[in-house]
Amino acid sequence: MNIIEIFSKNLKKYRLEKKLSQEKLAELCSFNRTYISSLERGIRTPSLKSIEIISEKLEIDVYLLFIK
């Protein structure tokens, strides 16, 4: 499993744990819902800024998005 696959899996895991839809997380982050969907499917690679924003809105430490 590569780092993008790990990130994608963890993004979805933490989003669901917080009971957020892709739409709601996108709204909180000021992103488009399709961007969140693409990240979760591993189609897009997030920028460092996007990772920072997502972790902030999910209320988790950044490193948790990259742990197997």
Spans of model-derived segments:
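A detector for short, charged/polar N-terminal pre-domain segments
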Residues: 1-6
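Short basic helix-loop element that most often maps to the first helix and adjoining turn
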Residues: 9-28
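Conserved hydrophobic/aromatic packing and binding residues within compact polymer-binding modules
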Residues: 11, 25-26, 36-39, 65
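Helix-turn-helix DNA-binding elements, focusing on the entry/boundary residues of the two helices
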Residues: 11, 22, 33, 48-51
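Recognition helix of helix-turn-helix/homeodomain-like DNA-binding domains
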Residues: 31-45
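Short, basic-rich loop-to-helix N-cap that marks the start of a DNA-contacting helix
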Residues: 43-56
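Short C-terminal boundary/hinge segments that cap the last helix of small helical domains
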Residues: 59-68
